Amino acid sequence: MTGLAWIWLSRFPVDSIPASLVEAPQVGFSAPDFTLPDLDSQEISLSDYRGSPVILNFWASWCPPCKAEMPAFQKAFQEYAGSDLQIIAINATNQDSIAAVLSFTEEHGITIPILLDQTGFVSKEYLVHSLPTTYFIGKDGTIKEVIIGGPLPLSLLRIQANGLIMD
């Protein structure tokens, strides 16, 4: 069935394919809403932050580049605390353990809101195939940038954060 859809869609120029048929999420499209528990078991939805720019970082405690970039995310979280920018770390808990997440955050003084993707549903919805993966989402809920891999330096996080705030 997938092959037939590809054959049918390949007859049209890319810009004429209806947005509903394009695999999402991607730059220029709305970020899919989700609801996940945080470390205190409180349910958090992306839509709770509609109207604010959001940086979503998918990570795991066993991932070396994830661990290397987490201090930059923590520093950015502290620097932008007075703004409407939201920085959220989504742990790929289906590939990690809550105990490892808690140990990592306590050991490294991480205070960024951490959501637990225990089933992997949100990671699949966001097409996360490599960790870390970071989505930069505008105030209107549109994906502005996606960076796969890391570690991201603080300087790049600042550039992206400032762009989201000014947008």
Question: Where do the model's predicted regions map?
Answer:
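Structural microenvironment flanking redox-active thiols in thiol-disulfide oxidoreductases
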Residues: 67-108, 118-125
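Active-site acidic short loop of glycosyltransferases
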Residues: 50-52, 82, 110-111, 128
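A short beta-strand-turn-helix
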Residues: 33-54, 77-80
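Hydrophobic beta-strand anchors of alpha/beta hydrolase catalytic cores
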Residues: 55-56, 87
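Conserved redox-active cysteine motifs that mediate thiol-disulfide chemistry
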Residues: 50, 58-75
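N-terminal targeting signals for export/organelle localization
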Residues: 1-30, 167
